[in-house]
Each structure stands twice: as C-alpha cells, then as structure tokens.
Design a protein with these regions (language model features):
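C-terminal structural cap/anchor segments
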Residues: 301-389
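Surface-exposed coil loops of outer-membrane beta-barrel proteins
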Residues: 95-134, 138-214, 221-223, 228-230, ...
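Outer-membrane beta-barrel translocator/channel fold
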Residues: 77-78, 176-237, 241-324, 344, ...
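Residues on the lipid-exposed face of transmembrane beta-strands in outer-membrane beta-barrel proteins
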Residues: 47-53, 133-137, 164-168, 211-217, ...
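Residues that define the transmembrane beta-barrel architecture of outer-membrane proteins
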Residues: 9, 41-47, 126-131, 158-162, ...
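Short loop/turn motifs that connect adjacent beta-strands in outer-membrane beta-barrel proteins
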Residues: 1-11, 52-67, 142, 172-174, ...
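Beta-barrel outer-membrane channel/assembly domains of diderm bacteria
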Residues: 1-145, 168, 381-386, 392-397, ...
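Extracellular loop and loop/strand-boundary signature of outer-membrane beta-barrel proteins
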Residues: 32-38, 119-120, 149-152, 193-200, ...
Length: 438
C-alpha cells in the first residue's frame, strides 16, 4: 500500500500475517540424567505491521531521509513441550521449551538464563517486538548513516539491530562502521525482543562493533574486517568473493566466496566453557562456498571449519553460513543450535535445486563432525508463491545426531565427563510456513 501526503512526502504501509510449524518425529520423554530429550513440535501464528516513509520532498534527489516503524505480535498455537515432566527429576515441574521460538526473554543481559526455570521462562515470554524504529540518511551513494532499530545486514548479526551504522564510499572503496547494542528476531518462526547478543559478565553491555574496508570491481570483492567487543574479544578476518554475474554474459553464474576470521579472547573469557569446550585464548573459523546458477537450476557446496572455539562469542548471533544452513534446527533443549557451532567442528554441505515457474524445489545434505557430537541430515524443500502476496514453504528433513561419550544433550558448563554415555537421537522433522503479505 503506497501513498503521498502533503504533496511531497511518500510513505509505504506493509503488513503480513502467517504461521510456521515444525512437526518433529521424535516425541520422546525427558530424562536429563541420561541426556534424552524430544525434538519438540510447535505451531505459531504471527502478524506484523510496518510503515516506512521519506521525510524529504521528492524534488531533493541527492539527499534521502527515511523513517520507519514496525512491530510484530505472535503466539504459540500448539506446543508439544508445554506439560512435559523430567523423569529424572519430576519435582522440577513442567519443562516447556518452545518459548525459545516465540517470545524468548531472559533479560536484556540474559541475566535470568540460569536463574529462571523453564516454566518461569515460558511465563515471562514476550511474543511481541517493536522491531523497526529508525532514521536513515544518505547522500547519493557516497555517505550514509542509519540508527535506531532496523533490519541488520551485518555479517555476524542476523535479525534486527538496535544501534547504528555509517558508510563512506570513494571510487571502488567503501568503509563501513557497524555497532550493535541489541538484537531482535521477527518473522513467522521467531519472535524475540531486543537483548544484548554479547555482554560483559551479564552486568553491562559495551556493544559489539565492526569495521569493514571493502574493495570491489566487476571481477572481485576483497573485504578485510575486524569485529570486537570491549573486554571480551577481538576478531580480525577477511572475505574474498568472485562472481561472474557482472562480467560474464552467459546462462551460467558462478559465485565463489572464502571467509576467515580469528577470534582472540580475553583472559577471563578464555577460562569459560562454550558448548562443553574450554573457550581458550585463540581460535579461527574458515568458511568457503560456491553457488552455481544455470537457467532454472542451482547447485552448490560449502565447508565450514572451526579451529578451537571460534563460535563462543561470534557466529551464533548470525554468520555467513546462515543462508546455507538452518542454524537453529536442533532440539530447543540444546538452545536449538546445530552442532557446527561446536569447538573443532567441520561441516560439509551440498545442495541442488530447480525453479519451475513459481515453485522452487531444493535437495540438500549436511554432515557435521566434532568432538562433542556428529550430525547427518538429508532434506528437501518446496517453496511456492501462489500469488503475488501468498507464500508457502514445506521442508522434510531426515536428521540424526550422535552425542559422543563424555557429552550430554543440554549440558554445556564443563568439558568431557566419562560418566556421560553416548546417545543417538532422531531430530527429523517436517516444517511448513504460509504467509500473506501486502
């Protein structure tokens, strides 16, 4: 819906309603002593409304000033975990977990994550968020600044940012500064109010910051960067991308990208544990992928490797691997994170797909190996745009996780424990979503 007011200013109103569901094949009991948990099934209903406007008269072409506000509200229409009891500790009460997807709120600094029971977390869920509230100024394509709450395009922050970013472009070079003091999620699958994605000892948020220097021509993109959080970590890295789209006039398009980043952790953080592995002082992560398009076909592959605990602070709030993997497709009793976040893990992925008019069919496979757990999955996804405003998605994924001896599902606070037996758990599921947008 578009409009013009005062004969000079433009605005756009957009809205969507939708639902997301995951039907898990594993509906087991909970036994925390043995590390046995169900995958969890749930169905959401959501609705969002957004207004974006231009605050400058149309006649001013070199300058742009935008403003936007938007919010979303949702609910769990079905939750298979709502009344589950832990057989190993029935006095602990109900053990709901799907609040993780719809309304997770454990304090801005995550200060209640260890203090509240699962039932208290369900009771304190906030299935609503004001995800957009921003000002965006640009001068031509040379300089720009954006601040407030808005969709994040940053490499290591998915969802919505609460902060600011600035860019300056000179010829083929671009400098970008990005700062975040909060992250939120707002879609059919997740609603999460703004919280500090990284904090200092759950006492204060100094903000996570990023500086990029980008050089780009029609053949190559080279982007050294550094991400840092005061008193926690510094993570220099770089991206190199080659894409044939801009210079090869062909039915083929081949994109190859290589990322590397090297988190260096502070003394206090290096002595902590992340996903049952000591964080340590030094680490590295490498990610390489290739995507190929030919006519209506697409296929590709990727490899993601952690050396040490590269995801302890950077990566699990968003990373370049997100478009390739559903990074939160495990049980919510593991905080839903896939095992490629584990220390010293390696993940190999491949996919092939075809578009048929408004239908996309894609087959994909994923293998993860790590000291803590191995995972294998093979799935197929169907995406169909019924009309201009109606969208459907269906995904069937066969998924198995083997927790190695010495590690246990949902247990992250210390390292190898020989008392923990190996478990093999089915994480297969059927996912679907539908939405109406205008």
């Amino acid at each position: 819906m578009h409009g013009v007011f005062l004969s000079a200013f433009e605005y756009q109103i957009s809205a969507r309603v939708g639902s997301f569901s995951r039907i898990a094949f594993n509906q087991s009991i909970i036994n925390s002593k043995k590390g046995i948990y169900p995958t969890g099934s749930y169905v959401t209903t959501t609705g969002a409304l957004q207004i974006d406007s231009s605050l400058l008269p149309k006649g001013i072409e070199s300058h742009k000033l935008g403003f936007g506000v938007g919010g979303e509200i949702g609910a769990l229409a079905y939750d298979s975990t709502k009344f589950l009891i832990d057989e190993a500790n029935p006095k602990a009460g109900f053990q709901p977990a799907n609040w993780y997807y719809m309304g997770r709120w454990e304090g801005y600094l995550m200060q209640y994550s260890e203090k509240w029971t699962r039932e208290q977390k369900a009771q304190n869920a906030r299935p609503y968020v004001l995800y957009n509230l921003y000002l965006d100024y640009q001068y031509k394509d040379i300089f720009g600044i954006k601040l407030g709450r808005y969709p994040s395009k940053a490499l290591f922050l998915s969802g919505f940012n609460q902060g600011f970013e600035v860019f300056y472009r000179w010829k083929k070079f671009k400098i970008v500064w990005f700062s975040t003091f909060g992250r939120a999620l707002a879609n059919e699958q997740y609603i999460r109010d703004f919280y500090a994605p990284v904090n200092y000892k759950q006492k204060i948020n100094y903000g996570m910051h990023n500086f990029n220097l980008i050089y780009e021509n029609k053949y190559i993109r080279i982007a050294p960067f550094i991400w840092f959080y005061p008193k926690n970590f510094n993570a220099p890295g770089f991206e190199i991308t080659h894409d044939t789209k801009s210079y090869w006039k062909s039915l083929w398009r081949i994109q190859t990208t290589f990322y590397a980043w090297f988190p260096l952790y502070s003394d206090y953080l290096s002595k902590d544990y992340y996903r049952a592995a000591l964080v340590g002082k030094k680490s590295a992560s490498l990610f390489v992928f290739q995507r190929v398009h030919f006519r209506s076909y697409r296929f590709g592959w990727s490899v993601y490797k952690n050396f040490g605990n590269g995801s302890a602070q950077l990566g699990w709030n968003g990373s370049p691997v997100d478009p390739f993997y559903d990074t939160k497709d495990d049980t919510p009793y593991e905080d839903a994170y896939s095992n490629f976040y584990n220390a010293n893990s390696i993940t190999i992925n491949a996919f092939v797909g075809k578009s048929i008019k408004n239908l996309l069919v894609q087959l994909y496979g994923k293998l993860t190996y790590s000291p803590r757990a191995d995972a294998q999955s093979l799935g197929v996804t169907f995406k169909y745009d019924l009309k201009k405003h109606i969208y459907f998605m269906l995904m069937v994924n066969g998924y198995q996780i083997t927790m190695h001896r010495g590690y246990k599902v949902g247990f992250f606070t210390s390292g190898y424990n020989p008392d923990f037996a190996q478990t093999i758990q089915n994480r297969s599921y059927l996912m679907s979503s539908m939405s109406y947008r205008f």
